[in-house]
Structures are given as C-alpha cells and as structure tokens.
C-alpha cells in the first residue's frame, strides 16, 4: 500500500479540525469491501470488522418532508419507490436493467489485478452485457444519465450526493456518467460501517 499523504487510510484517515478529530470523508464503505484488499492484508486480524448497513441510505431534501430509505434488496426498494414515487417505478426498473450489469462487471474486475487478458475474459464470460451501456454512460454526465430514468429530484439528488459530489466535481461534468451507478452498486455489494468508525481502516493499516 502506497500513500501520498503522511497518514495512511486515504479519505478514511483522521485529521484534527476545529479542536476535534474527524474523518476526511465520513462515509460508509462499499467499494473497499469488494476489492479484496482487506483480506489480502488480513486487516480483520488487526481490528477491522464491519457491521452491514441496511437500509443503505436515508434520503430527504430541504423542501420535502418525505424521508425514504434505500435497501440492498431490490424488491424492498421498489416497494419504497411505489409508496413515495408511484410514477418512478418503471424508470427504476429500467435503470437497474441497464446499471446492474455494469456494476457487477466493475465489482468482478476489481476483485483481481486488472490485466488485458483478465478484463477481456470477464467481458466474454458475461457475453458483453453492460459494455455498450458503460461506454455510452462514461461520455455523459451523471445528471444526464439519471435524468434518462427519473423525473423526481428526490430520486436523482441522493444518487448524485453519494456519487460525483463526493469526488469534488459537478454532477453535470461530462465524463462523470458512471457516477450514476450509485444505486446499482448498493444492490450489488454490501454497504458496511467499521466497528469503531471509519477511522478503523487507517488504524488497522498502521497495526
């Protein structure tokens, strides 16, 4: 593991700010749990253990009093959408049809060192499912992608907040389209929070 900063752990590491210790990016962990890094470094032996988080997200807005949960289970999430956004159910299903193959392919590819041979073999094994959509989305902005499926800002906003906005770029920036995978990724992988907080990642790395 190579770190450019003096503190290990990337955005999970802690800094002193206004007299308190905070994570640079206080977030639940999803992608990190799919890469195999924790297992390769045996971080559980050094204190990194997770609690699975479900619902994976609670969303609301400044102007709307509705608070709606997003679950890992697709059917439970569709039930929520039926309750809060009746005219968005078909759009969410269409989104998942396009997004899930991409998310599954990315997670699969991240599970081992990416070589040209391994990536090609994964695409072939999936019969190319998701490749065309992935290439098309990658040229668009995240906002453009999500607006192809959803009308309500209450559905679009939470996906953008945990996507490109976290990266520090506008969701209207061309080339951020794969940031629209937020919801799909939460169905494909387990969202978790380290026991002891996000800072347990750098602590376990130091140990």
Regions found by a protein language model. Give the residues of each.
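N-terminal glycine-rich phosphate/pyrophosphate-binding loop and immediately adjacent elements
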Residues: 1-107
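Active-site-adjacent bridging/hinge elements
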Residues: 2-5, 175-181
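A short glycine/serine-rich beta->alpha loop
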Residues: 17-20, 166-168, 189-192
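Short, conserved clusters of charged catalytic residues that mark active-site
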Residues: 32, 141, 200
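Short helix-capping/linker segments at secondary-structure and domain boundaries
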Residues: 42, 169-173, 186-191
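Rossmann-like flavin
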Residues: 63-174
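Helical element adjacent to the flavin cofactor pocket in flavoenzyme catalytic cores
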Residues: 137, 180-207
């Amino acid at each position: 593991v190579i770190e450019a900063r003096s503190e290990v752990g990337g955005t999970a590491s802690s800094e002193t700010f206004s007299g308190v210790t905070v994570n640079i990016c206080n977030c639940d962990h999803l992608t990190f749990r799919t890469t195999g890094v924790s297992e390769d470094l045996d971080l559980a032996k050094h204190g990194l253990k997770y609690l699975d988080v479900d619902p994976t997200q609670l969303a609301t807005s400044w102007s709307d009093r509705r608070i709606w949960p997003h679950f890992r289970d697709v059917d439970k999430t569709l039930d929520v959408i039926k309750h809060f956004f009746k005219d968005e159910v078909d759009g969410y299903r269409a989104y998942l049809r396009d997004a899930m193959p991409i998310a599954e392919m990315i997670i699969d590819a991240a599970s081992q060192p990416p070589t040209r041979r391994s990536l090609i073999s994964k695409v072939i094994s999936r019969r190319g499912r998701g490749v065309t959509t992935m290439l098309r989305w990658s040229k668009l902005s995240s906002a453009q992608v999500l607006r192809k499926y959803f009308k309500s800002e209450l559905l679009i906003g939470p996906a953008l907040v945990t996507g490109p906005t976290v990266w520090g770029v506008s969701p209207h920036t061309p080339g951020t389209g794969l940031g629209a995978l937020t919801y799909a990724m939460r169905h494909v992988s387990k969202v978790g929070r380290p026991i002891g907080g996000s800072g347990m990642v750098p602590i376990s790395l130091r140990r």
